[in-house]
Amino acid sequence: MAPIGEKKRFELEKSIEPIYTGGPVAFDSNEKILVTALTDRIIGTRSETGERLFSIKKDEDDYVTALAITSDSKKLIAAFRSRLLTIYEIPSGRRIKSMKAHETPVITMTIDPTNTLLATGGAEGLVKVWDIAGAYVTHSFRGHGGVISALCFGKHQNTWVLASGADDSRVRLWDLNSSRSMAVFEGHSSVIRGLTFEPTGSFLLSGSRDKTVQVWNIKKRSAVRTIPVFHSVEAIGWVNGQPEEKILYTAGEGNLILAWDWKSGSRLDPGVDTTHSETNAIIQVVPFSENTLLSVHSDLSLLLRKRVPGEGFITIKKLNGSFDEVIDCAWIGDDHLAVCSNTEFIDVISTDGTQVFGVLEGHTDIVLTLDSSEDGVWLATGAKDNTVRLWNLNIEDNVYKCIHVFTGHTASVTAVALGPLDVNGYPTFLASSSQDRTLKRFNLGSQLNKSDFSNRAVWTIKAHDRDVNAIQVSKDGRIIASASQDKTIKLWDSSTGEVVGVLRGHRRGVWACSFNPFSRQLASGSGDRTIRIWNVDTQQCVQTLEGHTGAILKLIYISQGTQVVSAAADGLVKVWSLSSGECVATLDNHEDRVWALASRFDGSLLVSGGADAVVSVWKDVTEEYIAKQAEELERRVEAEQLLSNFEQTEDWQQAIALALSLDRPHGLLRLFERVMTAPHQPNSITGNKDVDNVLVQLPDHQLIILFQRIRDWNTNSKTSMVAQRLLRLLLHSYSPEHLLKLSGIKDILDSMIPYTDRHLARVNDLIEDSYIVDYVI
């Protein structure tokens, strides 16, 4: 029996999965539905809650080139590289119509304000207008000499018009009433990436990668103003769509969104934009709400940017798009996680996956390791840039600050570990290891806030002969453990850096180690697929846990040190009881190796992250499970007693129904044997007419259960007579049409035929042998 307090059951509370892996994005501002493309599907997500509304399967090799959603939230239109244009019903995801759109892939498309027309632009330079309801072409416009890159519906002098831009640097205006070209605007020197009509319909604005916005007078067919925006433009539009505001935004290169007075050409928010990035660019912008835009970035991030007059567009929220490969995670606070995922940034996210609270920027290469303090205030990070950073986290105010940068390693930092907190709440020291095979200690404490703080290592030692994969600090801070590819775990005096023990026994490299916070034990996990529990004092292995089919990559203790949780390359997370040495729970929600594992400080939640870009949040439901088990046991005891009472009173109808619902094959067999050995009633197959009447009126779900029991009993000669009599009754009482509707009935009957033939042959042999008795007599 497991000790009191052990956790035996976990349920998946939240699976934070990628919603975006690149390509176009569509957004319905009315219902707040975000439509994005994944590798093998198109999904719709409620942007405010993260709830997945629909998922549309597509060919993995067929890339989505354009998306559009009607403003009434009823239809989604997707264009594919295969040149198909498909209309879907949402939220059901049902395909309404598919048709071949262009001779080349559709690059851009837009829907008119009435949800009647769809405009598509192809790579061949052709523009088509479609009737959405009828799914047929109403207009086809030729004239551009390159790929269509921007489209926009508008109204000019009560006439519906369509503007198109292409990589021939020209803007064309088409009259939808006459199906003719109204104007050709020339003035840009690069591809057109954004088009929008001034709210009165008198002017058309175009943005280009030539870093300018042109304002065109439609009536005069000429440019009235050129606005130099000083960045390559990928999108333009109106900040909130209100005509009286007339605030133009431009977005694109450098991660910038800027606000402009389109009449004067002056920038409205001259303050420094802190979101500027040389390597990250905005590839698409869609209106989200009043003064707020959703920007899609080349690094696959999705940001909500709100305009604050005088300050510019500030990031108010980051939506979880894709983590890429999750390498490590750490719990900070009650419902926040720090996650590193194959980038130089660390995301601070909510455990429900709805948003990213902050992004820790500072490392210049991929972050490989994290460790947080027990109070969630301090976070240590190590990266491929050979540096270690210490962060102070103010979760309540959502302020995250890098306090110090520690250097000295000559290769990627593979592991970091914080020492225990001092009386003032500061971590006493920080340990780090690297692919340079060294181990370093940096003193912290209250000196962190002093101007003369030294970020130099107190000591540096060559720890192992091969890469160091993991390090851990004991609860009291006296010992540092290091695990290496050289198959050993070494114990170090944290004050002096002297080795105090070497643990040998693993047959392959050791990937993980963890100190038991409540005893002098250490757990280690290796590429040999085993977990070893070591006595720190004697340095002997006291227990070996086996069950994974891949390398053990991460270990943590829970339940006051009575259990170990392991994450492995087989994609599984296992919970082990140290008292029995057995796995008490296996958590399966990953399709690739699980690198990251963390536990909330009260042990009520586990988090795992894997190479499949999925973060899984597991909730401890042991108490509910035990209570449910006790309730189920009580219910079964009562039902067993009730079944016994029914048998005693020969209430066969109630007895059979109860035995079937309890799924007790032995009890049901005993009941039928008793009926068939009792005095036989005439004209009854089972021997009792009441039983016959019950069996010929069974509901389908109980009927299929009975067929399954008959199949099992038919395999044994001792119980085959009961099975054959019941089978005869059922085949005579139910029509073939009725029986064929039962799920799996064909396989059940097919499996009974060989045994039935064998029983028939055995009975025939007995009959033949009985004639010998007649002959002798």
UniProtKB/Swiss-Prot annotation:
Segments annotated as WD repeats: 14-57, 59-98, 101-140, 143-184, 187-226, 228-270, 362-401, 408-452, 463-504, 506-544, 547-588, 590-628
Keyword terms of this UniProt record: Nucleus, Repeat, rRNA processing, WD repeat
Entry's localization field: Nucleus, Nucleolus
Molecular function in Gene Ontology: U3 snoRNA binding
SUPFAM superfamilies the UniProt entry points to: WD40 repeat-like
Pfam families: Utp13, WD40
Repeat among keywords: yes
Function according to Swiss-Prot or TrEMBL: Involved in nucleolar processing of pre-18S ribosomal RNA.
Protein name according to UniProt: Probable U3 small nucleolar RNA-associated protein 13
Organism the protein comes from: Schizosaccharomyces pombe (strain 972 / ATCC 24843)
